[in-house]
A protein has these predicted regions:
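Asp-based, Mg2+/Mn2+-dependent phosphohydrolase catalytic module
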Residues: 17, 30, 34-167
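Short, acidic loop-to-helix structural element flanking the phosphoryl-transfer center
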Residues: 1-31, 39
Length: 167
């Protein structure tokens, strides 16, 4: 299971790359994480780490492997002592996104500016309760979620992805 969670989704990963390249958005990740002790191995016996495991034939196989580098803001619950769906973690995320937007000279970020994506209803409900907009990403249906994200952002996110995702 740990190996699967480190393999980039064939629709979401290119969408993140396209959103970042557009220069129109501050990208943040809010992840319920675990800090594993040293020496833990995944289901294939590979020493576990936090790096991404790109499939060798993926068009993004030569991208960096540090997931946090794909975002402007990366909040790991294991490192801050809060977990989703605690409203405080969403409030922290808005403060961090706002600070990053200001650092980049993009003005500020208000809670209503944030579009929060998740697959768990309780996390979405909590995000909505603090004022964020939400988008449910159903497991196994990431292409549909990325299509909706494409409509919401006005950025082409699936162009050329369908063929590569089926490799």
């Amino acid at each position: 299971m740990m190996r699967i969670s480190r393999t980039p989704d064939p629709y979401v990963y290119p969408a993140l790359t396209a959103l970042r390249a557009s220069g129109k958005f501050i990208l943040g990740a809010l992840s319920n994480t675990v800090a594993f002790p040293p020496g833990i191995r995944d289901d294939h016996g590979v020493l576990f780490g936090s790096e991404l495991l790109h499939p060798p034939n993926a068009p993004y196989a030569n991208d960096g492997t540090v997931i946090a580098d794909r975002f402007d803001v990366f909040i790991s619950s294991a490192h801050i002592g809060l977990r989703k769906p605690d409203p405080k973690i969403y409030e922290l995320a808005v403060r961090e996104l706002d600070a990053e937007a200001r650092r980049q000279g993009l003005g500020g970020v208000n809670v209503g500016d944030v579009l929060f994506l998740d697959d768990i209803g309780a996390n979405l409900k909590s995000a909505k309760s603090v004022g964020m907009r939400t988008l449910k990403v159903d497991l196994g249906k990431t292409e549909a979620a990325v299509r909706e994200l494409e409509e919401l952002t006005g950025v082409k996110l699936l162009e050329g992805v369908q063929d590569r995702a089926r490799l």
